[in-house]
Structures are given as C-alpha cells and as structure tokens.
Regions:
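Kelch-like beta-propeller repeat domains
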Residues: 11-317
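Sec-dependent signal peptide recognition
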Residues: 1-3
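C-terminal motif of bacterial Sec signal peptides marking the signal peptidase cleavage site
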Residues: 6-9
Length: 317
C-alpha cells in the first residue's frame, strides 16, 4: 500500500514536505528496542521487547527481495535483552551489550560480546566489554576495529572503547571533546562517506547535539545541531550521501510538555546541514531503521500510549 504522508499537525517541527512510504510485511512479533544490522539482502533484528514487556533473544531476518520475515534457525547464545548494540564487518556480525532487567541492578547491564558468522552460521563469544556502561552504545565499524561510543549505567558518559578484531581486545581511548559535545545516554549514530557521526540523546533533558568521531585524532568534533527540539530514543541510518534521523521522544520540564516524534530529518556531511524530509505515519521511540540495497526500511518501536508496533515501511524519496 502506497502512503503519501504530509506533516502532522500535532508535530511542531515537521515541514509541509511529502515523503513516500510503502507499507511492507508486518513484523510477526511487535518489537521495540531491538538491535538491527544488515547483510546481503537481509535486515537482521536481535532482541528487544514485545507487547507483553517480555525481553527476547530471537534473531529475525527480513528479506528485502521477498518481503518476508523469518526467525533465523539458530540457537542464539545471548541472554534476552533490550538496547543491545550490533554491527557487521565482512561476513560477521558483532552483537552484544544491552540491558536485561526491569530494575537498576549491576547484573542487568550486560557486557558479553559475540560474533555471528554468516557463512558458517556459528556463534563465538569474544572478549567482554570492559565496562558496565552497556545501554545503547553506538557502534562504528572499520575493517580492523569497532568503536563503541557513549553507553549508560546510572550516569551519562562520553566514553569510547576500541575493539581490535584481530587481537580480540578492548581499549578505552583518551578522547578530546569540547564542552559543546556533552556527556549523554540514548544517543544514535551512523557512518556516512567514511565519516562517523553521533548525537542526540539525553542528559537531564533531550539533546540536539551532533558530533563527528575522528578515530585518527581521537576527537569528537561538534557539527550542526539537529533541527527542532532535542530528542532521544531516536533511530538513525546512513545512505551514500546523507544521515537520516527519525522518531524518538522529547522530555519536557513537566508531564505535559514532553512529546514523541514522527518527523524524519536528514544530515548532509558535505554541507554540515540538516533538513526535514517528511514524517512517519505514527510517533514512536525505539524504532528500527536500516539502509540496504539503496533503500531505507523503518518501523516497529513503541508509541506514546506504550503500544509496541509491528508496522514496517520502505522509505522512498
């Protein structure tokens, strides 16, 4: 079904621009706060929570060629969790970290880190993450390393750890950042044109910051802030030319000034500029977004009524 979406009258920061979303096959298991990664023609989704607030450790695959979801027939050795982190290097996915409980206890912050080989279909446990700041770490992958940025455990961080793929070791890096790049939790990020970008999130309020991670000089460099009010629990992906940011929520100073987002905006690394490009058919946090085969797919998440979504769309400009 082809949907033409205009700005939502209740969303203050959506311009009168149209975005075309093609509704695709719904996810069989409504999910929020899952970890997403792509390989060949499939979008993979690990973990997250369902409509009954149950955490899962299932691994699902969505085929972009057949428009079908399937549960991957593998014994996943990871515990059920939300807010895990994942990325792909070569023929392997790297998955782990996250939170497995509903109460704030140290054992709920998970430090395990795993490799899933798409060719052999085997799992391998790797070196544990060396800190317990394991909620929603944003991962950036290069050929020989993975950078785990930010994360959370009862305090806001600006930490960056480097995982050496060959040596199977983690190293905490000394990072240089100006005051305009805050400590935070619940950030998002993506790699575009070989450059790594991270931002938004929460620190005593929803944030608008946007920064570039320069691994060679170990610097977080301020970039143009996102449009509108701050947001956290958003999702982010990158095409060859742009970084797309969608959904999330804004925490207000009172119970009546907070709101959820359905807006989609994109960032041009070349021009260091943001622009609105449209909106989702619903407002939600902790959705999933992925770029694969020159297409963006987006959906799932939790709306402001606390309902976990199963909707799935292909985004077209």
């Amino acid at each position: 079904m082809l949907i033409l979406l205009l700005s939502s009258s209740c969303q203050k920061d959506v311009n009168l621009e149209a975005v075309r979303l093609v509704e695709r096959a719904a996810m069989p298991q409504p999910t929020a706060a899952g970890a997403c990664f792509v390989y060949e023609d499939n979008i993979y989704l690990f973990g997250g929570r369902d409509s009954f607030s149950t955490n899962h450790n299932d691994l699902w695959a969505y085929s972009t060629t057949t428009d079908t979801w399937r549960k991957v027939p593998t014994h996943v050795p990871l515990k059920a969790r939300v807010s895990a982190s994942a990325c792909v290097v070569g023929d392997c996915a790297y998955i782990g970290l996250g939170f497995d409980g509903k109460v704030q206890r140290d054992s709920s912050y998970l430090c395990d880190f795993w490799q899933y080989n798409f060719k052999t279909l085997k799992w391998k446990r790797l070196a544990d993450f060396p800190a317990n700041t394991t909620v929603k770490n944003c991962l950036f992958a290069t050929e020989d390393a993975i950078y785990a940025t930010y994360g959370f455990n009862r305090e806001f961080t600006q930490d960056i750890y480097r995982y050496d793929i060959q040596e199977n070791t983690w190293t905490k890096l000394d990072v240089s950042a100006p005051c305009s790049v805050p400590r935070a939790m619940d950030v998002v990020g993506a790699t575009c044109q070989g450059r790594h970008f991270v931002g938004t999130g929460f620190n005593h309020g929803s944030l608008r910051f946007w920064a570039e991670w320069d691994p060679d000089n170990r610097q977080l460099i301020p970039r143009k802030k996102i449009l509108g009010a701050g947001r956290n629990a958003a999702v982010c992906c990158a095409t060859d030319d742009y970084v797309y940011l969608a959904g999330g929520r804004h925490y207000g100073d009172t119970l009546t000034t907070g709101f959820f987002y359905n807006s989609i905006q994109r960032y041009s690394p070349q021009h260091d500029q943001w622009e609105y490009v449209g909106s989702m058919p619903y407002e939600a946090e902790n959705m999933v977004i992925a770029y694969i085969n020159e297409q963006i797919f987006i959906g799932l998440g939790e709306n402001k009524e606390g309902i976990i979504q199963d909707k799935w769309y292909r985004f077209e400009e």
